[in-house]
């Protein structure tokens, strides 16, 4: 819109009401500035709408957000007509914590990144890679912080965590817990689906922390839920970077350190292989003003582009 382009947007079929409200707000802004309302168009529907938009030659650029599987389908459809795509797909975002990290800042970035929006952001923190020298201190502080989390109605400002979006998301959460158990992970904070009058929807879950080896299969998958995988590294920063980069996804990443050399290494071409790299902030929440996008199985292209 800012550049004068018409946008047709299709939201997730799980959030039709949110999209209608957003479209109404956009429409009011357009009207106030004497811009035709058709500059922003909303189409609600299932995957068939997405297929139609991907195949339409009237749409030169398709920006798609979703799973890696979905992104491959969109890429094929748009590529068949030589169109352009921006793909923001799965994320498996990690924070590296070095011996020189500020512990308070680490806790703030990690907890917000892992449990904010109930772990349902593409940039949510999924993995915490901690140096052995500060591992126990970080682990103890993290458990203490999780024990203070309040779960409930997201419209109540006293609560920190709301529900997962639907029962399908709850099933994915429970399946990930089962895989952690089968693969030998150790629960530091156990997850569960909450019940009772406050949680009558059946979609409220407890944020969980599992102590794991970085090689576990479940750790290499994105679980769109508040499950954090805690793992240890030893030696220099390059060892932590190798663990971070070994997954297929490459959206957001962060390092907690007061060591300038470590930070520069992380940001360099031999550092993080993600589209977004942060220093002394978490993986989630600070990216809105920048060129947004990922690498590897997260797709390609950048929202906002080089102008950001």
Feature map (PLM): residue ranges:
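Rossmann-like NAD(P) dinucleotide-binding subdomain of oxidoreductase/dehydrogenase enzymes
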Residues: 1-105
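Structured helix-beta-strand junction loops
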Residues: 3, 56, 81, 176, ...
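Gly/Ser/Thr-rich beta-alpha loop segments that engage phosphate groups in nucleotides
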Residues: 6, 47, 68-69, 73, ...
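Active-site-adjacent beta-strand anchor residues
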Residues: 9-12, 43, 64, 96, ...
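ALDH superfamily catalytic-core signature
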Residues: 28, 61, 69-214, 238, ...
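Residue-level signal for alpha-helix termini/capping positions
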Residues: 31, 54-55, 79, 115, ...
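Conserved C-terminal structural/oligomerization subdomain of aldehyde/semialdehyde dehydrogenase
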Residues: 35, 59, 96, 150, ...
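Conserved residues at the C-terminal ends of beta-strands
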Residues: 46, 65, 113, 257, ...
């Amino acid at each position: 819109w800012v550049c004068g382009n018409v946008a047709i947007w299709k939201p997730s079929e799980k959030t039709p009401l949110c999209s209608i409200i957003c479209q109404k707000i956009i429409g009011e802004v357009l009207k106030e500035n004497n811009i035709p309302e058709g500059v922003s168009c909303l189409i609600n529907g299932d995957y068939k709408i997405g297929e139609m938009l991907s195949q339409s030659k009237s749409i030169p650029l398709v920006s798609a957000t979703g799973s890696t599987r979905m992104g491959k389908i969109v890429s094929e459809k748009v590529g068949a007509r030589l169109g352009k795509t921006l793909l923001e797909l799965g994320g498996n975002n990690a924070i590296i914590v070095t011996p020189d990290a500020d512990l308070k800042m680490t806790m703030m970035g990690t907890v917000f990144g892992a449990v904010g929006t109930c772990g349902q952001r593409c940039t949510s923190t999924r993995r915490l890679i901690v140096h052995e020298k500060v591992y126990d201190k970080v682990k103890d502080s993290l458990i203490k912080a999780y024990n203070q989390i309040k779960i409930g109605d997201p419209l109540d400002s006293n609560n920190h965590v709301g529900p997962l979006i639907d029962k399908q998301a709850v099933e994915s959460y429970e399946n990930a817990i089962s895989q952690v158990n089968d693969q030998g992970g150790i629960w530091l904070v156990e997850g569960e689906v909450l019940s009772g009058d406050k949680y009558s929807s059946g979609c409220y879950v407890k944020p969980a922390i599992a102590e794991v080896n970085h090689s576990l299969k479940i750790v290499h998958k994105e679980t769109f839920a508040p499950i954090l995988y805690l793992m240890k590294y030893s030696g220099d920063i390059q060892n932590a970077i190798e663990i971070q980069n070994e997954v297929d996804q490459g959206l957001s990443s962060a390092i907690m350190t007061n060591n300038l050399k470590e930070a520069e290494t992380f940001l360099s071409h031999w550092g993080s292989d993600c589209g977004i790299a942060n220093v002394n902030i978490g993986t989630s929440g600070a990216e809105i003003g920048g060129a947004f996008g990922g690498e590897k199985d997260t797709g390609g292209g950048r929202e906002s582009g080089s102008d950001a």
